[in-house]
UniProtKB/Swiss-Prot annotation:
This is Mannosylglycerate synthase. It comes from Rhodothermus marinus. It is an enzyme of class 2 (transferase). Changing residue 139 to A: Results in a modest decrease in the catalytic efficiency coupled with a 1500-fold decrease in the affinity binding value for D-glycerate. The mutant is 500-fold less active when D-lactate, rather than D-glycerate, is the acceptor substrate. The gene is mgs. Its EC number is 2.4.1.269. Its cofactor is Mg(2+); Ca(2+); Mn(2+); Ni(2+). InterPro entries: MGS_C, MGS_GT, Nucleotide-diphossugar_trans. Optimum pH is between 5.5 and 7. The keyword Protein transport does not apply. Homotetramer. Dimer of dimers. Divalent cations such as magnesium, calcium and to a lesser extent manganese, nickel and cobalt. GDP-alpha-D-mannose binds at residues 7-11, 35, 66, 76, 100-101, 163, 192, 218, 220. Changing residue 220 to A: Results in a 500-fold decrease in the affinity binding value for D-glycerate in the presence of saturating GDP-Man.
Length: 397
């Protein structure tokens, strides 16, 4: 018996309502809940349509506003945690699903695959899917890089899409997350990082099911569209950097299929707009803060005041930069947040121009090997990462 949840904010009503109908008609789903950020056009559309969908499918459908549960910017975290609270306190269902509201390729298989994995005993089921080689740059350059550098011996950096909003969890896992103060506090985009980290830290068994058609959803323009998400996802990693992950988590993955051509050939962001953005919004204090970084990074970013530059930010320069950011970055400080954005942008542009342009397969191989090099570097450096006893480590072959 399962509850399906769609958190939403300013989505196209027709897309969300299609997904609600798909979920409500699924034989494994006993209730559908939409969690709105505010009472807007989408909220009212769901509110009007819910009774008809309930009658047609026999599945209760409802919509409610997210509660203010966290202490950071009100956002996705409050929405997902509101759903956890409802699930635990107002229902007796055994499982809860989360799906992003803007998915245009959502179908019953998303639910079926997750349910079947849960039937096999996994506590958390995550969906993963093919992405364009220049998409998911926060995932690759912030979250998975941070996991590899800080916890190289754990499963964290092996999880395909740790920021994915498509997942199923059993009731006991939902309770464990909701009772964790770190999770409830994270009211913003960092919630996905916290869900991933805490479940691995607590040894929850994880299965990743593959969605071959990919996650079709609304796209963004320049990297500037992702600035808030970038800042909040990095801040989430920074807040966890001294945590220890001492027990291995069982982690299995469904084997991926061939990547569709329309995904392999897609460009994930507007390169021209992003290049121009590097030269904007500079302050004297940002230039002063560059003194904390290595000489190539400092001089390279200073150049960006006059013209776009990014050749200096290769993967090793980014690793060194990442450690400086972990130590010195201050969430809520406008200059630090802008500098983080510029540094990350140069890394993404460097990767795009030196790796992604060589083709999809080459780029994917590079990204996985990059994480491997980061894990190895972290394991060798004294004081970096939090290794577990070798006898406890699971094979990742």
């Amino acid at each position: 018996m399962s509850l399906v949840v769609f958190p939403f904010k300013h989505e196209h009503p027709e897309v969300l309502l299609h997904n609600v109908r798909v979920a409500a008609a699924h034989p494994r789903v006993h209730e559908v809940l939409c969690i709105g950020y505010e009472r807007d056009q989408t909220y009212e559309a769901v509110e009007r349509a819910a009774p008809e969908i309930s009658r047609a499918t026999g599945t209760p459908v409802s919509v409610r506003l997210q509660e203010r549960l966290g202490t950071l910017r009100p956002g996705k975290g409050d929405g997902m945690n509101t759903a956890l609270r409802y699930f635990l306190e107002e229902t007796q269902w055994e499982r809860i699903h989360f799906y992003d509201a803007d998915i245009t390729s959502f179908g019953p298989d998303w639910i079926t695959k997750a349910e079947e994995a849960a039937d096999f005993g996994y506590g958390l089921v995550r969906h993963y899917f093919p992405r364009a080689s220049t998409d998911a740059m926060i995932t690759w350059m912030i979250t998975r890089t941070g996991f590899a550098l800080l916890w190289p011996h754990t499963e964290l950096s092996w999880i395909e899409q740790p920021l994915g909003g498509e997942l199923l969890m059993r009731r006991e896992v939902a309770a464990m997350l909701y009772e964790d103060e770190r999770v409830r506090r994270r009211s913003d985009w960092g919630i996905d990082t916290l869900y991933t980290f805490v479940t691995v830290q607590q040894g929850v068994s994880i299965y990743e099911c593959y969605i071959p058609e990919g996650k079709a959803h609304r796209l963004y323009g320049g990297l500037d569209d992702l600035r808030t998400m970038l800042v909040e996802c990095f801040a989430a990693i920074q807040s966890l950097q001294h945590e220890v992950v001492g027990q291995p988590a069982i982690h299995r993955q469904e084997h991926p299929h061939r990547v569709p051509v329309h995904i392999a050939e897609r460009v994930g962001y507007d390169v021209e707009a992003t290049l121009h953005r590097l030269m904007q919004h500079w302050t004297p204090r940002q230039v002063e803060l560059l003194e904390l970084f290595t000489t190539p990074v400092r001089e390279g970013l200073r150049t960006c005041q006059r013209r776009p530059a990014f050749n200096f930010m290769d993967e090793m320069a980014w690793a060194a930069t990442y450690h400086v950011l972990l130590e010195h970055f201050q969430p809520g400080d406008p200059d630090w947040e802008e500098l983080l954005f510029k540094l990350w942008t140069t890394r993404v542009l460097n990767y795009t121009m030196t790796v992604a342009l060589r083709g999809y397969d080459y780029a994917q191989q590079y990204l996985y090997r990059m994480l491997g090099r980061y894990r190895y570097q972290a394991a060798l450096e004294n004081g970096r990462g939090h290794p577990v006893p070798p006898r406890a480590a699971l094979s990742t072959a």
